[in-house]
Amino acid sequence: MNESVWDARIATWMSSLLVLCGVLAVAGLVLPSPAVEAAPTPGYQAMAAPAKPVRLVVPALKIRAPILPIEVTPQAVLDPPRNPRDVGWWQRSARPGATKGQTVLTGHTVHTGGGVMDRLGKLRKGQLVRVVTPKGTMTYSTTRVVTWSKAELARRAVSIFAQTRPTNRLVLITCSGWTGKDYTSNVVVFAKPLGVREKTAAA
Amino acid sequence: MRSSLRFASIVGAFALSTVAITPAMAAAPVSQAGANAVYLAVAGNGQGTGTVTATNDGSGEKKNNVGTAPTVVGALGNNPVLKAGVAAQDATAGVADGAGNSAACAGLAGEDGSVVKIGSGNCLKPGKALTLSLANLDLSNTTLIQPGTALDPLTSQLPALPVGQTLGTVTAAIEDAIAGTPLGEIGLSGNFGALQARCTASPGTAQGTANLANTSGDDQHTPITLSLPGGTSVILAKIPVNPAPNTKVVTGLDTVTQDIVNALKTQFNDALDGVAAPLDTVVDAIQDQLVTNLVAQLQPALQPLEQQVLDITLNKQTHPTPDSIKVNALDLQLLPAAQAAVGSSLVNLQIGNVACGPSGRVASSAAVAAPEAPAALPTSVSAGYAAMPGQHAGQGDDSSNAIVLGAFALLMAGAAGFISFRRLHR
């Protein structure tokens, strides 16, 4: 391979890098920064300190359920509490009120009915989700509702579960895609924190 | 450019190889244990059931001598001390969370006893009584009596006597006599269901225990009996089933000291009378001197008896290092005083011998490589039930409701029919 070929390749790489830098610069100007996204919503204030979640309330779906801490199995499976009416909080995920990471909650869907998250897929963007803690109730606003296959979820495990996010968000997960034998997919709901409702606003 | 890349590649490959090889070269056992059911030495000549050893350097357990000595008879042949029984000896060495751990268990059970898998518990289930007996111990092949020791006074005088040529005959006779002395007829017996020791070790610590299950019906103690010529027997001690570490069996030994001395004199004289008769009066002096010297040599050794003649330790524990241990369920030494003569106790019997530790940790690089990371982040959420727990799939709310409605309709139809029937028959 002669030097002219190398020169051509290097030029191509450099050009690509320049284009990428330009794209990033534009994106940085257009897209809101994390600091802007994390700014308190009017009527809400930041939680004094992160706290363990104890109850999930989703008014649009008439969900009011206790939250119990859960742990991932050695096989990397996150199992909700045994009682399908309870919600599980992955205790290695962020506590509500944290400014970083992701708060991961999961609950059962029961094909014959009765599961706490049977209707999670019905949630719509903008609908509120409340997580009660001993130090206040965090309110979240739904930003996205998606259904992913089990394989897709596994591929996206880092983005869904990793606690390296610079801003906090709530993740609700349940099963879907009942085949008559098992579930083939997951419904995943993302919600951004609004904060704890200010007392004046609440009154 | 190309030569630089080649050089860099070679250096890189060498570095990688070094990193890969170094742990293997440096691999030392992080856990280790050994087990031996029985060791019997007569005058320093030992035989036993072999030793099972297990080691682990983090790459897997390695064991030696697995499956040795299924029975005492098979292991010790025609030994006069232990009769038929079941021997167990096993050791294991593992690694958990990067920390080495080991365990060992060894011992004897009577006939029909059985070996159970080694673990944290015992490795033997008791069978018939396991009788420890030294009653018929044959001392004729030992070198307890050597001209250089007990017979020193005699050997220094005999050359000046006209019977010097008879030295060999007399020495042989003495050896024969010793073979038939009370020392050869001392009986030590105890009936055990099983007699075993076990140990465990992990980084920084090592523990051991011994268990002497008995068959006497007494759950707490097992009697050890010493029998003397003429049928006399003395219960030396009632030993606890779970003796404390380094329990000495000494109770009552001093009461039999004189009995043994007297028996020794009688036996020596009786034995020598026949052999030495042709030597007339000269021999009498030699005989007196011989017996006197012999007993004189032995007598200090019998005081105190428990230290010089019979030394039994139960649950003998030693710590070669703070994080390792050796345990002997029973360590018996007959005539330790013979050490000066033969370089060892006349008889040394050890039953249930185990050793555990020391333990270490697998090198941190291996620990880091442990598959912990994948489990830290979920890759699957299993949040679906076919039906509510306790409810079969396919019998959901709808079908349940249908059944209830059907039953209700039948009930109403029955009630209507009953009312109609009553009306028609009024």
Enumerate the language-model features and the residues they cover.
Chain A
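N-terminal membrane-targeting segments
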Residues: M1-G43
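Solvent-exposed, non-transmembrane regions of membrane-associated and secreted proteins
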Residues: A27-A203
